[in-house]
Amino acid sequence: MTPDHGPLLYEGKAKRVFAADQPDRVLVEFKNDATAFNALKRAELEGKGRLNCQISARLFEMLEREGVPTHYLDLVSETWMLVQHVDVIPLEVVIRNVATGSLCQQTPIAAGTELSPALLDLYYKDDNLGDPLLSESRLQLLGLISSQQRLEIEQLARRVNQLLLSFFESLDLLLVDFKLELGLNSAGTLLVADEISPDTCRLWDHRNSDPQARILDKDRFRQDLGGVIEAYGEILKRVQGV
């Protein structure tokens, strides 16, 4: 079902954002598009938008119950979500609990190494620049956020990490790493925005020891492992308690 909505405000790789009936709200439609490597790899996967929308809704609801402010307001349909309008901070906050992926390519840290405390990195959100990693000095040079906002972002991200780690662990899932996008609402409150889904989280299945079969996230698409929709569907089943 497509809800009544205003004009298209923005279209990204995985979602479309439309005006809603109030200026401080927007409607988000989750698409079936799958992309990787800054959209150099593309495909359309039937059902992906529905799965990511519903997984994100359940995870936002869990965070809200735990007192974490998010932009989420309501699940309007299987693929549409009503959220607060936010001014997105142009940073990707990446938290790593286990070393894998680019961290192992860029450092001598062995894949599978548990990271305690979790590693928190900030990346400048710009596809044209390849979303570069920002040092503290470069962050100050760009003037994207104040020192106080930097502290608030780290505190919020680490709180989200602890909640998601515990929640996924209760579902026999390991949260390897994930990215967060944050924004400020009309009152200036820092909120978790965008989505939290297998597109943005690496999730490994504790119930499966096979190094490929245990992958239940976007790496199945990145690495041509197949079974992307089945993996996302398994995440939704567990998140919903089915």
From Swiss-Prot:
User: Which GO molecular-function terms appear in the entry?
Assistant: ATP binding; phosphoribosylaminoimidazolesuccinocarboxamide synthase activity
For this protein, the record's InterPro entries field holds: SAICAR_synt/ADE2_N, SAICAR_synt_PurC, SAICAR_synth, SAICAR_synthetase, SAICAR_synthetase_CS
Report which reactions are catalysed by this protein: 5-amino-1-(5-phospho-D-ribosyl)imidazole-4-carboxylate + L-aspartate + ATP = (2S)-2-[5-amino-1-(5-phospho-beta-D-ribosyl)imidazole-4-carboxamido]succinate + ADP + phosphate + 2 H(+)
Name the Enzyme Commission number(s) assigned to this protein.
Answer: 6.3.2.6
Entry keywords, A to Z: ATP-binding, Ligase, Nucleotide-binding, Purine biosynthesis
Which pathway is this protein engaged in? Purine metabolism; IMP biosynthesis via de novo pathway; 5-amino-1-(5-phospho-D-ribosyl)imidazole-4-carboxamide from 5-amino-1-(5-phospho-D-ribosyl)imidazole-4-carboxylate: step 1/2
Domain of life of the native organism: Bacteria
GO terms classed as biological process: 'de novo' IMP biosynthetic process; cobalamin biosynthetic process
Q: Which NCBIfam families match?
A: purC (TIGR00081)
What family is reported?
A: Belongs to the SAICAR synthetase family.
Q: What is this protein called?
A: Phosphoribosylaminoimidazole-succinocarboxamide synthase
Recorded source organism is Prochlorococcus marinus (strain MIT 9313)
